[in-house]
């Protein structure tokens, strides 16, 4: 963990120096007189985006109803449906500040202009009862609605609903009556007025009120006002009664009650023929008409009537109008003047438009008040009511906004009803904003939007990525955010001000990506290292090949999943805990790193002057993430050292062998406690207590090893498995790297060509008012004396006037110079003269704008804005482009001393088209060249021995992401193009760096073996499995990020206020997709570049598959040429200790045949008992032993026992077998056997005269067991005889011999099958090997029938069987020996690791004690799964957890495949001629 070998710390130091070097260079570039007054900067809004607002006298909401089939909507059916829509809008109510408002409160009412001819001061002088009368008339005035129903009488019903002409008349009458009583007093007579129509009440009370005498109300004024009231009453009266959709008469409203009356009339007619004639029904309507229920089918009946235009049958009551002729004229109706002439604004053709046909769209315009007009109306209402007005312009704007949203919701709701779907009419609110005035998007809304996006992404990553420690990761994410914002505010403010613009959004996006990436990296590192520590396993830390595990990609997917569950932890542990200085820096890396500074400075100075702010946005997150990762590694390293020290002390204290009672205590779980254990028990218990179980427990019947994958969230685990499976499939394609790399490079070349293709963009139609160009200077807190500012402005004015094609409209600087020459007598009073000039010439305030004056004598107000106005002499496109280019050069020249900004229609249009896009291509190519060099240097320093081809390909494809996005931005002429390309470059680097470094690290581990201590065991016939952890991490990161931005894009497309963010969000999604695609190409192409090197290394250096093969080849080379004819040295004769034991369950079981067993047993019966037969080996599928006696004619089947051969004779079959020493008991001999098993057979010899008594006891035991097995052996012999009668004895004998040879070869082959990550198991001794010499103890395995095999899930193991099966001194240590004390032998460990203990599901038998548990019992992260039981039958009762049907289908498919394989193998054996 030294600094010079830690690349993470070195990268942090380099990034820090680069960042602060750029900041220091920027400070030197500023004026030396610059002095910062405020410690914390201020924020100034310059507008993030530009939107259009309405500039008319009132707000118009347009509603369009379109017939999808293009049918002419001038019909009864569509007018009726349109009337229902307006009826719903008229009853629309919203809740605003604990009060209810309707359309009548916010709509514009043109009739009230009749009373606005006099001034407001005159109206305030009216008596209170007159003011009350005028206020109520204003409330009853109809709203301005432009609709085709204005041509019909139906509009009066709608206005009656909106203005409450027929509702709340009692309340209206009471208000007018109270104002009248207040005027006349208590003693006068009170008139009685009663009416259900609001305008009638106005007329009646107006007659009474104007009869009252008033001193302030003269007769002339009274008469004039009374005439206006009559005019108002006349203006709202209808002129003719033409109904759009009448039922009985025009006065009948179109509501459900009248439809209900019609339904009642239809239901009263029982005869369908009469009903059909009277109501003009069709044949298809018979079922509906006869089964009609007016209560239950009310809504369906109304819609059915509208579809069939059932109102035609009432044509005798009201004449059907000519709809095309009526609606094409001037349809004012309620809106007309005194002469009854129509107003042009209400022309009928205005209400129709065309999409598919001429009249398939019906339009309605509802006019609303502006916030200013609404504020005035509300204040006047509060004044008349005697309330203190609380209305402000902000509240008025909020009320208008809420009502417009409610109007859109109501329209959308109406569009989804059943009637609209039947007649296929779509209703929507049109966007009718007038593009006359530009207004910046609210910075408050933008800040809220950014915060919500931040929160959305953090929530998704917390759930799906940071599942190991979600709260801790989220907390560190926000800590990095806070520190970055704090540093940005201090070092990136311009003159103490941070401008809220699109550049700030770019820095926020860069911060978000970097912070998410570093937080994810830290979370993964900490989680994986903690799992390695929890296992307390001794990793091979002295080797760099801990993670070099090979697996055949064509093997079972479950084996691949099992391998993947360990490779992540092993690789993380190897990278962190390796003692070797593997990732060392290349030579001269210090000198090479110095080149980074001038390259970055060139890019900052000539290309992007804001690159220092990008570095500031990344620096805090990078530093904190690096520190967090190093701290975690150091902490886990110390914890690991403590565990290893503890294990060494335990091994030293328990080195002596445990026998007798100590052995019983040990297997009972009572471990001897030492002083060291007492000292460390507190620490170990705290470690285990703080750790959570990482894996799910496997049930005894399951074989799904994917549950071992340590990803707590199921979706994340499944996704990573899919990504890894796809990656493994891609690795099989040898030419895929070339197939993908060539098109990727061609796409970059094509993108470069697209940057120079002239794209036709929109042309601009201008008038004389759009020819002006304004040069503005915004100087925020510019603390210099006025003389320097004036000199800079004077120089700029001279430079811009040197452009000959511009003429000056206003130049405040020249005006000030003339004023200064006339009044300036003292050179020290220049600042005071400026303020005097501003105050004396107020006309200049339109040119010079400022908000407040500073108190000091040497400072300028904040903000202080200067404006110079010029005009274009020539308006042709070529001249304007040349002027724009000259202005851009002048603005860039003065950007250091001033902050000039050019605005204007012509300038902005041609600047975007001509200047920006022409310079954009050269800018991107220059940026690409600089970053290719920079990324190559970074790769050379921080990667592991990169090749030239791989480095160039990585740099090219990372920069290719930027070029491809730049071409896309160029083709679509998108704004903020520089922001998109910078983000593309940053995202491309993040997506490709980790997988690229992992590939290079893997390459060095394979090819640079001289720097390691061991040789990796790799199979030359299998493809090398590349590191896939980094690829899966990057895929999970970017897929979730793309998902978050996709959700954001959907929200932006739905919410109208966020539509302006839709296009930037889509561009960000495209950037991430392109970055991930190029990252995949980098990984595949880089892998195939050095794959040939790896294959050459395997064939040339290893010369085979394993280390043992390599040793054997070396021995063969050293043999003399003269001894080549001697017998070859067998590989199994070398005493080569394997690195780790083979896997027990990955080798498939041998094919088993019942016929073989029956023939074998019959042959044994008929054979000569005195003739010695071959000793069969133990089959992997059977656990019983068959013992043959040398002096007996019977076979003994002893379950779970081995035959002991002492002095060349079988103990189980010969009663006269001699034991070592006369008079020795069985217990003494068994103790001797145990001592022999502990010391090894080479260190203990038996005497052939010992053990007579022990042999007798053993013989008695065998006799008893022989009697118990007599019946079964007899039945088996009878069955064998029946089979042999069908064939000749000689053929059976030959066939049996051939089958024995085939089974023997299959056993040898099965024994040598390799596990997924280990070399082959050495073969056992040959079958025909002679018996060993006298005086040695050997174990001979025999085959027992299938019926006597122990069920490891229900029957406990036998200690004697473990001792007999695992006491061979040639066996390697048990693979789980490191989880038990050092004194535990292999049989003891095997007994403790039996499946009965590790997968126990039931209760223990009485008297049986559980053996000692391993060290990692409570936090074991991987366990060898049990073999799959294809004969498993589910229990009859229902399981506690529902099992899907797909699981049972999969089980049946496996069983069927297994049976087919067995049948094919059996048929192959029968068809073999040798058999």
From Swiss-Prot:
Keyword Transmembrane helix assigned: yes
Localization (cell): Membrane
Marked site (Cleavage) residue numbers: 1088-1089
GO MF term list: signaling receptor activity; transmembrane signaling receptor activity
GO biological process annotation, one example: germ-line sex determination
Stretch list, region Interaction with fem-3: 1133-1273
Residue intervals passing through the bilayer: 446-466, 474-494, 496-516, 589-609, 737-757, 902-922, 928-948, 952-972, 979-999, 1034-1054, 1060-1080
Basic residues: compositionally biased ranges: 1178-1188
Region (Disordered): 1142-1194, 1267-1330, 1424-1475
Principal location class: membrane
GO CC list: cytoplasm; membrane; nucleus; perinuclear region of cytoplasm; plasma membrane
Region (MX regulatory domain): 1392-1413
Bias (Basic and acidic residues): 1276-1310, 1451-1469
Keyword Acyltransferase among UniProt keywords: no
Keywords: Developmental protein, Differentiation, Membrane, Receptor, Sexual differentiation, Signal, Spermatogenesis, Transmembrane, Transmembrane helix
Substitution effect: residue 1393 to K: Causes weak somatic masculinization; prevents binding with tra-1
Job description of the protein: Plays a major role in controlling sexual cell fates. Promotes female development in XX animals where it sequesters one or more of the FEM proteins to the membrane thereby freeing the tra-1 protein (a putative transcription factor) to enter the nucleus and promote female development. In XO animals it acts as a receptor for her-1 which prevents it from binding to FEM proteins thereby repressing the activity of tra-1. Negatively regulates male development when bound to fem-3 and is required together with tra-1 for promoting spermatogenesis. Also required for feminizing tra-3 activity.
Name of this chain's protein: Sex-determining transformer protein 2
